[in-house]
Amino acid sequence: MIVTETIIRFENVTKQFDNDPPVLDNVSFEIEKGKFYTLLGPSGCGKTTILRLIAGFLEASEGQIYLGDKVINQIPANKRPVNTVFQDYALFPHLNVYENVAFGLRIKKLKKDAIDKKVQEALRFVNLKGYEKREISEMSGGQRQRVAIARAIVNEPEVILLDEPLSALDLKLRTEMQYELRDLQKRLGITFIFVTHDQEEALAMSDEIFVLNKGEIQQSGTPIDIYDEPINKFVADFIGESNIVNGKMIQDFEVEFVERRFECVDQGFRPNEVVEVVIRPEDLEITSAEKGKLQVTVDWMLFRGVHYEVGCIDIDGNEWLVHTTRKVRVGDKIGLAFEPEAIHVMRLGETEEEFDKRLDSYDEVQ
């Protein structure tokens, strides 16, 4: 049995500025020690506010924030065992790499030998050994990020907070840094809490993801759970690309949409309950119109390098996106084939607690 330790806990936390609507609205969650977490959502969803509340840069309007079993609402930022890596890295341009990393240790008035040992170890962890005397202006974007991370880990925090640190990098470097950050977190064993609006970053790097919208956590779970079992239309649409249509759950394992009934793997709904149905573009296969489970007309097509994106319209006017290596022509009448496992049925207005209970009931039946 694996024993997990909760390091951060939010209990009914609300953050409101003046008389504006809450930026965070009665949010509760737990962060376990030694994992890589991502707060994911669009601009203004509250993800950076959570980070600032943990860091101590903001104070909660309501609710309690715990570090371990201790309430930290009133503890100032400089007394909390957390360090933040900012979007612009916040490095000192007049200091070289070594002095940037050593800055916090000098503030703590550590002895010179202790500072040197910690700085050298931190630089080794981020693969910057030998860059001690390099000026910040001479560093690339990826190298500057590693300096910022070294400065964060040198203080041996319990938690590292990362506020969209990859957003300023080009695509190739951003991908490389995703692997580096994930590897670094595993080697350090420190809890990382990463903020991003990029769902691909979140899926690639995280042990756990919190999906936020309008100040509320919509869903939390592993990347695979959230991608394969989105709780609602927002999550399904925000995490990857989705085809979402209205449907009706006829009975367990049978759903109706686009005027036809299909076998599925979902259960626990009321007979004839109105639902929303999700099928991912990569789970659709183009066939002849006669062989397809759905008949559609090709509306547009784009070449994406590794595959084509094909947009189609069904008889009800629903739009369908397909990822395929098969080339078709605009105006073609084609069929779409898919397996029962490709269908995901979502209950309207279901809370995360209700959703989790329904998924647990699947396991009990199986």
Curated annotation (Swiss-Prot):
SMART domains the UniProt entry points to: AAA
Protein's cellular compartments: Cell membrane
CDD domains hit by this protein: ABC_PotA_N
Alphabetized InterPro entries for the sequence: AAA+_ATPase, ABC_SmlMolc_Importer, ABC_transporter-like_ATP-bd, ABC_transporter-like_CS, Mo/tungstate-bd_C_term_dom, NA-bd_OB-fold, P-loop_NTPase, PotA_ATP-bd
Membrane topology: Peripheral membrane protein
Gene Ontology cellular component terms for the protein in this record: ATP-binding cassette (ABC) transporter complex
Location (main, coarse): membrane
EC main group: translocase
Domain ABC transporter, residue spans: 8-239
Any one GO MF annotation of this record: ABC-type putrescine transporter activity
Binding locations of ATP: 41-48
Domain of life of the source: Bacteria
Statement: the UniProt record of this protein carries the keyword Oxidoreductase: no
Pfam families tied to this protein: ABC_tran (PF00005), TOBE_2 (PF08402)
Catalytic activity: ATP + H2O + polyamine-[polyamine-binding protein]Side 1 = ADP + phosphate + polyamineSide 2 + [polyamine-binding protein]Side 1
Biological role stated in the UniProt entry: Part of the ABC transporter complex PotABCD involved in spermidine/putrescine import. Responsible for energy coupling to the transport system.
Family: Belongs to the ABC transporter superfamily. Spermidine/putrescine importer (TC 3.A.1.11.1) family.
Self-association state and partner proteins as the record states: The complex is composed of two ATP-binding proteins (PotA), two transmembrane proteins (PotB and PotC) and a solute-binding protein (PotD).
Protein name, UniProt field: Spermidine/putrescine import ATP-binding protein PotA
